[in-house]
Structures are given as C-alpha cells and as structure tokens.
Regions:
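Conserved catalytic core of nucleotide polymerization and phosphodiester-bond processing enzymes
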Residues: 1-181
Length: 181
C-alpha cells in the first residue's frame, strides 16, 4: 500500500520532481541552489560529489533533500507577493478600511472583512488574480498552474463556505444564504 501511494505521488508530481532534480543538478555545479526571486542556499557537499550513485555520501544526499525542501518552500514567497499585490489594490480602493490582513500561513492568507457584499466581491475578484500570478520564468509551466479560491468562515471558524472564482453577486448571496440556513 505504501509503495502504491508513493508511486501515485511520483506520477502526480512528475513535473515538479523533475524541476527540483534539475535545480539540484545545477546546485551540484554551482555550489548553491537558487530559490524564489534569487534566494541562494549553499550546497558545498553537493558541489564536491557525484550525485545519484551508491558511493554518494549520505551527508551529501541529506544536503540535497534539505536544499530541495528549501527550494520548494522558498516559493511560499508567492503568497507574500500575492498579498502585497492585493493589499496595494485594497489601499487604493474604497475598501481600505473594510479589508484587513490578519495572517499568512504557508500558502494561505487570512483577512478580516466587514460583513458586506461589496468587499467580498472585491476580494474574490482581485485576490484570485493575485494568487494566479506565475510570470516568473522558474515557475511558469503551461500545464502546472497556480491558483486558489476564497473561503468565508462565517459565523465562526468552524463553518467554511468555499466561494468559486468569478461568482456573481447574486450567486454569492445565494451561496451564503444556503450555507448559513
């Protein structure tokens, strides 16, 4: 069962896995892996060994795993980039006092939004565009996209209402009414 789960994982993420391996191969030549927006993480052991054979030291393989994790996690900066883009639009709009950021966790953003249709519609439109950004050449891929959807937690955190991108005002009203009874 575990091998089947791993095989399906590898099949699902084949493009991402190959991308990481290509970056680690380059790190073995350069002595560092280049992450999001130019971040460099040194890889001195990878630079000194031949990767991928039975004589590759365990420490070098461990450094490769760590560098691969750092590479992937560095792209969590996309979440910060999306928040900055979105909040610039909020501050320039009539909603500057009705939409407030309160937390960012890995690939999620949390906002306090007044209980009003207009700021919800604004957030659903502009935040969705911001999180779909993938114009950096290191992450652009025609088949692997970025994205996300807005969720409303109402009347409390235990009640999630998933809001489809591009929903109409009437559709949002009906969605919230049906979810809150």
């Amino acid at each position: 069962m575990a091998k089947q789960v791993e095989a399906r994982y590898q099949e699902l993420y084949v493009v991402s896995s190959q991308w990481v391996q290509n970056k680690l191969n380059q790190a073995a030549k350069d002595g560092y892996v280049t992450g999001a927006f130019g971040l460099r993480v040194r890889t001195p052991l990878l630079h000194q060994v031949i990767r991928g054979n039975r004589r590759t030291p365990y420490e070098a393989e461990a450094e490769g795993r760590t560098a691969g994790n750092a590479l992937g996690q560095s792209w969590c900066l996309l979440n910060s980039r999306a928040c900055s883009e979105f909040m610039a639009k909020v501050r320039a709009s009539q909603h500057r006092l009705t939409i407030r950021p309160c937390a960012q966790i890995h690939d999620a953003q949390y906002y306090l939004i007044r209980d009003d249709l207009d700021p919800l519609m604004f957030t659903n439109e502009h935040l969705a565009k911001a999180v779909n950004w993938n114009d950096h050449p290191d992450i652009y891929h025609p088949e692997v996209g970025l994205g996300g959807e807005l969720s409303i937690f109402y009347p409390d955190w235990s009640k999630e209402i998933e809001v489809p991108n591009g929903i109409s005002e009437q559709g949002l009203i009906e969605l919230v009414q049906s979810a809150t009874g």
